[in-house]
Amino acid sequence: MRGGIGNMMKQAQKLQEELKKAQEEIAKMEVTGESGGGMVAVTINGKHEARRVSIDPSLFEDDREMVEDLVAAAFNDAVHKLEQESQQRMAGLSEGMNLPSGFKLPF
């Protein structure tokens, strides 16, 4: 029995280290979201901070509200992509751990 608890503690410690490493990797990631068929692109990092915004010059000839909407849509697309990538990386950590059904990482 004692060995089982010790192994479980080692496994939990290893998971904690892997989780920390994955979070650090995610924080360094950059993803780009697009809208308007690529006419607007927003790049964010893993901390959801905007790093770059690119707007096709032809959009400045159109109305301002449309450009604002496209920037917001591109930012939201980038956030969605970051969340998907984060979930995929975290899912790999829980494989083979016999976690209860519905139990997800991070804690």
UniProtKB/Swiss-Prot annotation:
HAMAP family: DNA_YbaB_EbfC (MF_00274). InterPro entries: YbaB-like_sf, YbaB/EbfC. One of its GO terms (cellular component) is cytosol. Homodimer. NCBIfam families: DNA_YbaB_EbfC (TIGR00103). The lineage of its organism: Bacteria, Pseudomonadati, Pseudomonadota, Gammaproteobacteria, Chromatiales. This is Nucleoid-associated protein Mlg_1509. Its main location: cytoplasm. It is found in: Cytoplasm, Nucleoid. It holds the Pfam family YbaB_DNA_bd. Belongs to the YbaB/EbfC family. Keywords: Cytoplasm, DNA-binding. GO terms for molecular function: DNA binding. Binds to DNA and alters its conformation. May be involved in regulation of gene expression, nucleoid organization and DNA protection.
